[in-house]
Amino acid sequence: MLLALLRQHIRPYRRLVAMLMMLQLVSTLASLYLPTVNAEIVDDGVAKGDTATIVRLGAVMLGVTGLQVLCAIGAVYLGSRTGAGFGRDLRSAMFEHIITFSERETARFGAPTLLTRSTNDVRQILFLVQMTATVLVTAPIMCVGGIIMAIHQEAALTWLLLVSVPILAVANYWIISHMLPLFRRMQSLIDGINRVMRDQLSGVRVVRAFTREGYERDKFAQANTALSNAALSAGNWQALMLPVTTLTINASSVALIWFGGLRIDSGQMQVGSLIAFLSYFAQILMAVLMATMTLAVLPRASVCAERITEVLSTPAALGNPDNPKFPTDGVTGVVRLAGATFTYPGADCPVLQDISLTARPGTTTAIVGSTGSGKSTLVSLICRLYDVTAGAVLVDGIDVREYHTERLWSAIGLVPQRSYLFSGTVADNLRYGGGPDQVVTEQEMWEALRVAAADGFVQTDGLQTRVAQGGVNFSGGQRQRLAIARAVIRRPAIYVFDDAFSALDVHTDAKVHASLRQVSGDATIIVVTQRISNAAQADQVIVVDNGKIVGTGTHETLLADCPTYAEFAASQSLSATVGGVG
């Protein structure tokens, strides 16, 4: 998976990689040539007292060193550019794919693990790419070239290489095989600690209200300890790599000096050749060490690549059709459900069964029912946040699955049950409601705020009023009104309010509804509500109970003909005042 991921996202940087490899090749060859020049200086210059030879070879050595340094600097620069571009592209690919996920895929992975995979996991692979860019050509050429040059200097001592290099390779392979499962567990534990942190931060009010700080502290401590223990185990194995490598290099160097000294003493070898052989021996083992350091990063990067590939290979449940359809004259807003049935993945029974209804332009359809009856799920089907299991949802006679999702959603102004606001300003949040090509003016923003009765509390700082993440610096009612204003900005063909007035007082609720009726024109309005006062004003009321429609009509007819609705109205003590029925 790692190789496939690298091959896919490194393709745009092939020219940079080719230039990088060329510079590394020149730099490595220059490094391999230096010990030979050094040996000639010792044997032909120093040993014979030939100053001219020393100066001449010294100048050559200086020139080769300068070339090696320049090429190395260029290779590092190109490697950094390649790594940074690769990381940027991979993060973008993750983001672009994740935003296509429906609620089903998002719930399957969970927000904490998606955040970890998009940031920490990408960073681990980026680190591998940057290290690989450094040793991509250097390590193998230095190793092979070093062996060739060492044999050229003194073939009789090459048996030391045949012993030390395999020992080093086998030892490091043994260590890495133990590190791989530990890194896989670490990434899972990082997801867990992010999940705990996110729960605590999101539910800080609940934690304090129920004085559960101690419990949350213990839960975080458990997750933190588990991650620390896994990291310690992985770190212990990783820490073995350097001592094992250092021990092998030092032991081999001692053996080389010992046997080389014996050959010099017997006149079979010159001092310069021993110095050169030592240099090549060090370069060979350094190449192995560089490869080892890369291999040390490889297990964790492999695990991260698996996790990233899992996300990227997960198809979005709500894909676009090959030949999308769209009404010739634009969306007018006729919404029809024909035998719509929906079952959540893994559930034993459907949450909605055989739902059929029609909402027409210029009318308001209220959907009422008890908690858990399936009202919000019904709205999700209309907005195509989920696809029906059976039946169909049609907008202007076209199945929503045959629309391009962006064109469908651009015709819908949704105010969800949880009125989420993005960090930034009020103006930034209102612009979210604009269409793809719509330029939202300040006048339109203030008009939308007026419709939602939100202009009063933003009057002080105006449209530049700061909004914290999630809108936590506003009350629940203020968040709902800003979310309503965001939907109004678009002037959509279909308004969908999913219990969007629950935090408003009766007076503000009535004011907002009156303003909406004025600006909605021929738009279709669908309101999910728990308030009979809201349903009473609708042109059509749909009563949902246990996933089925048990009543359709106006407020007055349902009070007389639908026991479920009558009971619902009686529980709010509104039937007598609104419907005239006791």
Curated annotation (Swiss-Prot):
The record ties this protein, via SMART domains, to:
AAA
Question: How is it placed in the membrane, per its record?
Answer: Multi-pass membrane protein
Residues forming the ABC transmembrane type-1 domain are 17-300
Cysteine disulfide partners in this protein: none
Residues recorded as binding ATP, renumbered to this chain, are 369-376
Q: Provide the family line.
A: Belongs to the ABC transporter superfamily.
The protein's name is: Uncharacterized ABC transporter ATP-binding protein MT1311
Look up and give the organism this protein is from: Mycobacterium tuberculosis (strain CDC 1551 / Oshkosh)
